[in-house]
């Protein structure tokens, strides 16, 4: 609980125990207990992993973790992955030597023969991993697309604001669906009726207006980013369960960010691997 809920490093836990009169407890003792506990939890973690990938709609995200490189006497920026089953609200963390390569998530999905929707941010590694796999249908994140247009407001307010307004309309439709308590199928039909024309018009707008701006400009970058992911976003029109953004996945990762501020780094790759195993 102290380590995973409150993100308290072992050395600080020992200080707390000493204040309570337990002066013989050492960091190596806690570390030993921790490793044995992780070993006992391993079958449960593997079953959770299987359960997540047996679902047909998951979200994935990655976050950084500093890991000490003793040869170079520095902390290297490594990556750990999170995969969340949206409908079942289960999540797992995965560490593969700190790699952010798309092969990591591809290997995980293949290991459990995953078939379904995988929602992610705009990281190109997902596209590389699954572009040749017809069983995995990628979704992207409308919030990430919106952020790029927000960054272009100062450079080209008219163009950026047009895109932001269309995205706002899409979320307004979703709020109406939420407020009226529509079923997933009713939501799909409502999206087909109201959101599809917006999505299709936006695609045409990007095709016709995007070529007028330099790819190096802020608005050019925003349009390119959105356009290359727009077909993936269109998947949301076909299934009322699908979300327009990856926000819930980022919420799952947020405690890791908090922990990173407390423990600062992992001592080695093994420590990071141990850290991810019981995280769910």
Language-model-detected regions and their locations in the chain:
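Basic, short loop/linker segments at the boundary and entry of helix-turn-helix/winged-helix-like folds
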Residues: 1-4, 22-25, 271
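Conserved small/polar residues in nucleotide/adenosyl-binding loops
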Residues: 275-280
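Short, conserved catalytic/metal-binding motifs centered on acidic residues
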Residues: 13, 61-63, 118-121, 144, ...
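Short, contiguous acidic/charged loop-to-helix segments that flank catalytic cores in large enzymes
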Residues: 240-243, 262-273
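Short active-site loop/helix that positions an aromatic residue
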Residues: 126-132
């Amino acid at each position: 609980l102290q380590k995973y809920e409150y993100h308290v490093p072992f050395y600080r836990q020992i200080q707390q125990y000493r204040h309570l009169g337990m002066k013989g407890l050492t960091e190596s003792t806690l570390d030993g207990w921790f490793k044995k506990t992780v070993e006992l939890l391993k079958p449960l973690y593997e079953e959770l992993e299987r359960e997540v990938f047996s679902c047909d709609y998951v979200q994935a995200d990655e976050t950084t973790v500093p890991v000490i490189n003793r040869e170079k006497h520095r902390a290297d920026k490594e990556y750990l992955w999170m995969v969340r089953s949206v409908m079942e609200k289960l999540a797992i963390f995965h560490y593969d030597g700190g790699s952010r390569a798309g092969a990591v998530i591809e290997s995980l999905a293949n290991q459990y023969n995953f078939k379904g929707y995988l929602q992610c941010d705009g990281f190109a590694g997902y596209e590389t991993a699954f572009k040749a796999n017809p069983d995995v249908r990628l979704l992207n994140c409308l919030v990430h697309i919106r952020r790029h247009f927000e960054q272009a407001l100062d450079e080209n307010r008219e163009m950026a604001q047009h895109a932001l307004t269309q995205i706002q309309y899409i979320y307004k439709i979703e709020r109406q669906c939420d407020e009226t308590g529509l079923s997933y199928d009713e939501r799909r039909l409502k999206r087909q009726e109201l959101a599809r024309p917006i999505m299709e018009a936006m695609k045409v707008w990007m095709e016709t207006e995007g070529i007028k701006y330099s790819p190096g400009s802020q608005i050019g970058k925003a349009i390119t980013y959105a356009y290359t992911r727009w077909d993936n976003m269109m998947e949301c029109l076909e299934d009322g369960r699908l979300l327009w953004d990856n926000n819930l996945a980022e919420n799952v990762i947020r405690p890791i960010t908090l922990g990173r501020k407390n423990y600062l780094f992992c001592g080695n790759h093994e420590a990071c691997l141990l850290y991810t195993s019981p995280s769910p």
